[in-house]
UniProtKB/Swiss-Prot annotation:
Ranges annotated as spanning the membrane: none
Record's protein name: Ribosomal oxygenase 1
One example GO MF annotation: histone H3K4me/H3K4me2/H3K4me3 demethylase activity
Cofactor(s) this protein requires: Fe(2+)
Top EC category: oxidoreductase
InterPro entries noted in UniProt: JmjC_dom (IPR003347), NO66-like (IPR039994), RIOX1/NO66-like_C_WH (IPR049043)
Length: 544
C-alpha cells in the first residue's frame, strides 16, 4: 500500500504536538510607571499618544533626472563603463585594481545605490527616510547570490537549523518558526518551502565567497560591521510579521518579486531604535508611507526603527538579500564607553568627586522623596549638575573611540585578498610539502622590500595606558565572533614604525624606511606583520 507523503512541516508539527515555537513572540507592552526620577523626565511610552505630532512621512523616492545624469557621469570609473552595464564579477575584478580599500568601498557602495549619488543619499535618506531604487534591469545584482547557490550550499556545507538557517511562516496574524534540530538538508528544506514556509539564511557570508567579498569591502565604508541575511519566500506567502530592526537595511531584490510596506516609526522613542521590536499586529502599525513591489534588480533602503513587512505575490517566488550595518554605532553607544572612563579619571584627579555625600541626603533624595519641595533637593541637584559639567574635561575621548574600534575590528569579516595581494602575502608564499620534505621555506624580506597593509582598516593601535596593542582582522572568522578578538602587544621600538605604516597607506614603503632605531627592529616588525597576514609586498617573494 502506497504511503501518503507527509511534508516536513506536517512531520515537525506532529512531533511537537501540533505546536511550533515562535522565534519572535509578541512581547507584552512594558508597564512604565510615570514618575520623576531624581529630576529626570519620565520615559515616554512606546505607543502613539493623543495629540502627539506625527513624524514627517517618508515618501517614495526616485532620483531626479539631474541626479541620474550626474550619477551616470560620475560612475564611469570601471573601465569607462556605467555601473548599469557592468556585471558584478567584472566590477569586483576591476575593484581589485584599485589600490586603496577605502576607494574600493566607496565605489562598491555607489554601485549598490546607483544611480542615486552617495552624497545625496547620506544627506537626504541615511537615518532619515526610506528610498526605493527601481532599475528595470533584472540582472543588475546577478552574481551576488541565487537560488542555485542556495541549493549548492545546502548540499555541500554544514548548514544547521537555528544557527545558519530558519524556517518561518506568518499566517492569520501568527508568526512561527519551524526549525527541527540538526543539519538543514535540501530534501527537508525544499519540502518546507513547498509547504509555504519562508527560508532565511542567517549568515550567507560564511558560505558564499561573493557575499563575503562584498560585505568585507562595505564594512570599510560604514566603519561598522556589515552583515547579511538571505530570504527565500514561496509565491503568495509571507514569512515574517510586521516589525522594525536595529540596523540600517538595504533590501536587494535578486530574483522574482516582493510586495513591501514600510511604516514610519510609531513614536519618537522608536526613531533610530537601539533594539529590534517584537512582532506587531496589523492594527498596531498604522498606514504605510511606502507601498511598493520590488522587482529583481531593485533596492529598498529604510533606517532602523521603520516598521516593515514583505509578502510574496501569487505569481512568483522572491529571493532577496538584506545588507545591514550600523548596529549599536550611535553617539550614545560611544558615550556608554566614555562616561565611566571619564568618571574614573575625574575621581582620581579632582578632589570634588571624592568628597563625601551629605550626611542627610537619603532623607530628601530618592523616588520616595521626589515630590517633596525641599531646598536641600535643589542644592543637591545643582551640585550634581556642576559635577557633570566638570566631567566633560576628564573625558578620554580618543581612548573611548579606540574601545569602539576594538569592538568593530572583532566584528569585522577578514579581508578577501585579491590575486595580487595574495601573491605578495604570507598566503601566497611558496613554502610547501613535496618529495618528503618542506620546500621553499627560506623566503626572506629584505631592507629594500616594499610593503603595505592589506587594508586601510585591517589593524589599529590601541593603548590601555601601560601597554600598546595592535588589533587586527586578518585572522577573524567568516562566522561572527567564532574567534576571540585578535591582538598582540607591541614592543616599544615598533610603535612609531607601526603608526608610520598605518598612515602611509595606501603607499608602499620599504622596510628600510620604517622609523625604528635599528635595522634588526625594522626587519623583526616587518616579519611579524607578514606572518600575521597584515602586509603584502609590491613584488611576490621568492625562495632563496
Amino acid at each position: 500500500m502506497e504511503r501518503k507523503h507527509m511534508s516536513a512541516l506536517s512531520i515537525y508539527q506532529s512531533l511537537s504536538g501540533g505546536k511550533t515555537p515562535q522565534a519572535e513572540d509578541k512581547a507584552p507592552p512594558a508597564k512604565k510607571v510615570k514618575r520623576k526620577e531624581n529630576g529626570v523626565r519620565p520615559s515616554k511610552k512606546a505607543t502613539k499618544k493623543k495629540g502627539t505630532k506625527p513624524l514627517k512621512s517618508s515618501v517614495r523616492s526616485s532620483s531626479s533626472e539631474k541626479e541620474k545624469h550626474e550619477g551616470e557621469r560620475d560612475c564611469r570609473e570601471m573601465n569607462g563603463k556605467r555601473f548599469d552595464n557592468v556585471a558584478l564579477d567584472i566590477l569586483l575584478t576591476d575593484l581589485a585594481k584599485v589600490n586603496n580599500s577605502r576607494d574600493r568601498a566607496n565605489r562598491l557602495f555607489q554601485w549598490l545605490i546607483h544611480p542615486v549619488q552617495d552624497k545625496s543619499f547620506f544627506r537626504d535618506n541615511w537615518e532619515k527616510k526610506p528610498i526605493l531604487i527601481q532599475r528595470q534591469n533584472a540582472d543588475y545584482y546577478k552574481g551576488l547570490f541565487s537560488t542555485a547557490e542556495f541549493d549548492r550550499i545546502l548540499r555541500n556545507d554544514d548548514v544547521q537549523y537555528g544557527v545558519n538557517l530558519d524556517v518561518t511562516s506568518y499566517t492569520n496574524g501568527k508568526r512561527e518558526t519551524h526549525n527541527p534540530p540538526g543539519r538543514a538538508l535540501p530534501y527537508t528544506v525544499w519540502d518546507f518551502y513547498e509547504s509555504g514556509c519562508s527560508i532565511r539564511m542567517l549568515n550567507p557570508q560564511a558560505f558564499s565567497s561573493t557575499v563575503w567579498q562584498v560585505l568585507s569591502v562595505l564594512q570599510e565604508k560604514f566603519g561598522s560591521m556589515a552583515g547579511a541575511n538571505v530570504y527565500l519566500t514561496p509565491p503568495g506567502t509571507q514569512g515574517f510579521a510586521p516589525h522594525f530592526d536595529d540596523i540600517e537595511a538595504f533590501v536587494v531584490q535578486l530574483e522574482g518579486r516582493k510586495h513591501w510596506r514600510v511604516y514610519n516609526p510609531r513614536c519618537e522613542d522608536e526613531v533610530l531604535s537601539l533594539v529590534s521590536s517584537p512582532n506587531f499586529s496589523q492594527d498596531e502599525i498604522g498606514e504605510p508611507v511606502m507601498d511598493v513591489v520590488l522587482e529583481a534588480g531593485d533596492l529598498l533602503y529604510f533606517p532602523r526603527g521603520f516598521v516593515h513587512q514583505g509578502d510574496c505575490l501569487p505569481d512568483a517566488h522572491s529571493l532577496h538579500i538584506t545588507i545591514s550595518s550600523y548596529q549599536r554605532n550611535s553617539w550614545g553607544d560611544l558615550m556608554l564607553k566614555l562616561m565611566p572612563a571619564a568618571l574614573e579619571v575625574a575621581m582620581e584627579e579632582d578632589v570634588e568627586f571624592r568628597k563625601g555625600l551629605p550626611l542627610d541626603y537619603l532623607q530628601y533624595m530618592g523616588v520616595q522623596n521626589s515630590e517633596k519641595e525641599d531646598p536641600r533637593r535643589d542644592r543637591f541637584m545643582a551640585h550634581i549638575q556642576g559635577l557633570m559639567k566638570k566631567l566633560v574635561s576628564f573625558a578620554p575621548v580618543d581612548a573611548a573611540v579606540d574601545q569602539k574600534a576594538k569592538d568593530f575590528l572583532h566584528d569585522c569579516l577578514p579581508p578577501l585578498l585579491t590575486a595580487e595581494e595574495k601573491a605578495g602575502s604570507v598566503y601566497g608564499a611558496p613554502a610547501r610539502w613535496g618529495d618528503s620534505e618542506a620546500l621553499d621555506v627560506a623566503v626572506e624580506l629584505k631592507s629594500q622590500t616594499r610593503i603595505k597593509l592589506v587594508r586601510a582598516g585591517a589593524a589599529r593601535l590601541c593603548s590601555d595606558g601601560d601597554t600598546v596593542h595592535l588589533y587586527y582582522t586578518t585572522e577573524n572568522s567568516r562566522v561572527y565572533h567564532k574567534e576571540a578578538s585578535k591582538s598582540f602587544e607591541m614592543k616599544t621600538e615598533h610603535i612609531d614604525a607601526m603608526e608610520f605604516l598605518i598612515h602611509s597607506y595606501p603607499k608602499f614603503v620599504s622596510v628600510a624606511s620604517l622609523p625604528c632605531e635599528t635595522a634588526e627592529a625594522k626587519m623583526s616588525l616587518a616579519e611579524l606583520l607578514f606572518e600575521k597576514g597584515l602586509i603584502f609586498t609590491a613584488e611576490p617573494l621568492t625562495a632563496q
